Amino acid sequence: MAGSKEEFIEWTLKKEWKKLLRYLWTPVDGFINIPTGTLHAIGKGVLTYNISRNADLTLRLYDYDRIDPSTHKKREIQPQEVFENVNIPDKKIEFQMFPASYEFGCKVTRYWDEPGLYTLFRLQIDENGKFLHDRFAFYTCVKGKGTINGIPIRQGETVFVPACMGWMYFKGNMDLFLASYRNENV
C-alpha cells in the first residue's frame, strides 16, 4: 500500500499492482465495510451486496482490461480523478465475522447499524419465521425462495417494505439481506 500520493501515482503509472493493492482472502459469510474513497476490487466468484450513498460516480483505476459490450472497447479508466479522490494512505480494512442469533424462526446476523450510514442484517429462514424492524427496509433474496407477508420473492429479487409495517412473516427456505438507514442513535 502506498504511503503517499506520489508513491501511489508512481506505482499506478508503472502498473505495479502487487505493491499498490492488498489481496484479501474472502471467507464464506464474511463482511467488509469499504469506506468512501477506498480503492477496491471484487475478485472472481465473490458475491457482494453493495450499499452506497446516493451517488452516481464510479472511478476506475484498473479494470482487468475488460471490454464494454456496447462499444467493444476497453472500459474507460479515470486515473487523474482517482488520484484526487482516493484515501492515501489508506486505512487497513479486513473481513469480519459476526455471530448469528436465532429469533422467531430466523437466523439473524447483524453486520452493520451505523446512524447516518446504513443498516445491514442477514436473515436466514428455514420454513417459517418472523422479524420486527421499525424502519423502512429493502429485503433482497440472495438464495432460495419464499414469501414475505405473502409476497413471493426468489433469488435476485428485492422487496421494499415501508416503515411502521410491524412484523414481517416469512415462509420458505431463503437467505435475505435487510438493508435500511437511520438518522438517529436509537
Annotate each predicted stretch with a short phrase.
Residues 1-28, 43-84, 91-145, 151, ...:
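Active-site region of the double-stranded beta-helix
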Residues 34-36, 106-107:
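Glycine-rich, charged/polar anion/phosphate-binding loops
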Residues 38-41, 165-168:
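Short, charged beta-turn/beta-strand-edge "cap" motif at the junction between a beta-strand
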Residues 105-107, 163-166:
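Short small/polar-residue motifs
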Residues 172:
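Glycine-rich, small/acidic residue-mixed loop/short-helix segments
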